[in-house]
């Protein structure tokens, strides 16, 4: 990224009352101009307390969705709409519906790295740091962990 582009981005952030969040996995030159850098959960939580009216989320699509869910009144931009995470699509709404028909007393536990659509059809959303604690506290006898059973 050239110095001129970085300066223009800084100018636009100030002009538009915007903040730039960058995930650890984005290119270093993007991280250099970011206001905050972190993992998806940290950035989502951080966004709630920001005064900026526009949040630019430099990461994959589920990260932008998570920020928007927590900040419905703000404009959330995703610079690369094609940026995606394969894990976010490893489960489907149809699979959730089928599991609910098959198992009584089912709790659908969704990992944060999932699409907003999957989160909407889940009972609870967890991170790797709190998944065990939350699942142990659930009263349900049947747990369906999505999107990837290896995370469970």
Where are these regions (language model features)?
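Active-site loop-to-helix "anion-binding N-cap" substructures in soluble metabolic enzymes
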Residues: 1-152
């Amino acid at each position: 990224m050239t110095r001129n582009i970085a300066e223009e981005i800084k100018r636009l952030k100030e002009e538009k009352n915007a903040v730039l969040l960058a995930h650890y996995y984005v290119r270093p030159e993007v991280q250099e101009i970011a206001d905050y850098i972190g993992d998806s959960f940290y950035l989502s939580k951080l966004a709630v307390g920001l005064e900026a009216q526009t949040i630019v989320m430099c990461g994959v699509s589920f990260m932008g969705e998570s920020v928007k869910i927590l900040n419905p009144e703000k404009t959330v931009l995703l610079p690369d709409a094609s940026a995606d995470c394969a894990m976010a699509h490893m489960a489907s709404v149809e699979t959730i519906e089928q599991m609910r028909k098959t198992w009584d007393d089912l709790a659908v536990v969704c990992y944060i790295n999932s699409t907003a659509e999957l989160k909407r059809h889940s009972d609870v959303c967890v991170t790797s740091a709190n998944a065990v604690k939350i699942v142990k506290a659930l009263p349900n006898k049947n747990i369906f962990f999505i999107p990837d059973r290896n995370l469970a």
